[in-house]
Amino acid sequence: MHSRKGASSLPRGRGAGKKTELTEEQRQEIKEAFDLFDTDGSGCIDAKELKVAMRALGFEPKKEEIRKMIADVDKDGTGSVDFQEFLSLMTVKMAERDPREEILKAFRLFDDDETGKISFKNLKRVSKELGENLTDEELQEMIDEADRDGDGEINEEEFIRIMRKTNLF
């Protein structure tokens, strides 16, 4: 067995049927999203808050999907979801994520000029937006590390390859 620290425990295939263990980081992320939208501190969130909390975690649920999810987990029939119910819901949703699609979503955030590649300029912009104080040299090293074809930019396949090496996906 390998260490779970930093390694994703999400299944690599789409919608693997077995129960998935979340990393501590994922649990924390889910807890923060829940707390953020439990504005009255009741320990529960309603359908509208559930939708916003899921959006904060990178999901885009439809109204009908929200209704069905609440019906599935709302054992006490209150019409709202407590943290344990939300956690079990999000554990299932995270297991259904397609890692390749998640990586490509991230790629598109970097590639804001839609060239199909991540340039030095793209990387620098994202670094600034995230408040990372990286030097130009460090940013260039990141590009050099991922750039397999030597064109000075990172294409989708190069990005997917480097992201898979990180064990985040």
From Swiss-Prot:
<comment type="similarity">
    <text>Belongs to the centrin family.</text>
</comment>
<keyword id="KW-0206">Cytoskeleton</keyword>
<feature type="binding site">
    <location>
        <position position="78"/>
    </location>
    <ligand>
        <name>Ca(2+) 2</name>
    </ligand>
</feature>
<dbReference type="GO" id="GO:0016460">
    <property type="term" value="C:myosin II complex"/>
</dbReference>
<dbReference type="Pfam" id="PF13499">
    <property type="entry name" value="EF-hand_7"/>
</dbReference>
<feature type="binding site">
    <location>
        <position position="49"/>
    </location>
    <ligand>
        <name>Ca(2+) 1</name>
    </ligand>
</feature>
<keyword id="KW-0479">Metal-binding</keyword>
<dbReference type="GO" id="GO:0016174">
    <property type="term" value="F:NAD(P)H oxidase H2O2-forming activity"/>
</dbReference>
<comment type="subunit">
    <text>Monomer. Homooligomerizes in a Ca(2+)-dependent manner. Interaction via the C-terminus with other proteins disrupts and/or prevents homooligomerization. Interacts with SFI1.</text>
</comment>
<comment type="function">
    <text>Acts as a calcium sensor. Part of the centrosome outer core complex.</text>
</comment>
<keyword id="KW-0963">Cytoplasm</keyword>
<protein>
    <recommendedName>
        <fullName>Centrin-1</fullName>
    </recommendedName>
</protein>
<feature type="domain" description="EF-hand 3">
    <location>
        <begin position="98"/>
        <end position="133"/>
    </location>
</feature>
<dbReference type="InterPro" id="IPR002048">
    <property type="entry name" value="EF_hand_dom"/>
</dbReference>
<feature type="binding site">
    <location>
        <position position="74"/>
    </location>
    <ligand>
        <name>Ca(2+) 2</name>
    </ligand>
</feature>
<feature type="binding site">
    <location>
        <position position="42"/>
    </location>
    <ligand>
        <name>Ca(2+) 1</name>
    </ligand>
</feature>
<dbReference type="GO" id="GO:0005509">
    <property type="term" value="F:calcium ion binding"/>
</dbReference>
<dbReference type="InterPro" id="IPR000629">
    <property type="entry name" value="RNA-helicase_DEAD-box_CS"/>
</dbReference>
<feature type="binding site">
    <location>
        <position position="38"/>
    </location>
    <ligand>
        <name>Ca(2+) 1</name>
    </ligand>
</feature>
<feature type="region of interest" description="Essential for homooligomerization">
    <location>
        <begin position="1"/>
        <end position="21"/>
    </location>
</feature>
<dbReference type="InterPro" id="IPR018247">
    <property type="entry name" value="EF_Hand_1_Ca_BS"/>
</dbReference>
<feature type="domain" description="EF-hand 4">
    <location>
        <begin position="134"/>
        <end position="169"/>
    </location>
</feature>
<feature type="binding site">
    <location>
        <position position="40"/>
    </location>
    <ligand>
        <name>Ca(2+) 1</name>
    </ligand>
</feature>
<feature type="binding site">
    <location>
        <position position="80"/>
    </location>
    <ligand>
        <name>Ca(2+) 2</name>
    </ligand>
</feature>
<dbReference type="InterPro" id="IPR011992">
    <property type="entry name" value="EF-hand-dom_pair"/>
</dbReference>
<keyword id="KW-0677">Repeat</keyword>
<feature type="binding site">
    <location>
        <position position="44"/>
    </location>
    <ligand>
        <name>Ca(2+) 1</name>
    </ligand>
</feature>
<dbReference type="InterPro" id="IPR050230">
    <property type="entry name" value="CALM/Myosin/TropC-like"/>
</dbReference>
<feature type="binding site">
    <location>
        <position position="76"/>
    </location>
    <ligand>
        <name>Ca(2+) 2</name>
    </ligand>
</feature>
<feature type="region of interest" description="Disordered">
    <location>
        <begin position="1"/>
        <end position="25"/>
    </location>
</feature>
<keyword id="KW-0106">Calcium</keyword>
<feature type="domain" description="EF-hand 2">
    <location>
        <begin position="61"/>
        <end position="96"/>
    </location>
</feature>
<feature type="binding site">
    <location>
        <position position="85"/>
    </location>
    <ligand>
        <name>Ca(2+) 2</name>
    </ligand>
</feature>
<feature type="domain" description="EF-hand 1">
    <location>
        <begin position="25"/>
        <end position="60"/>
    </location>
</feature>
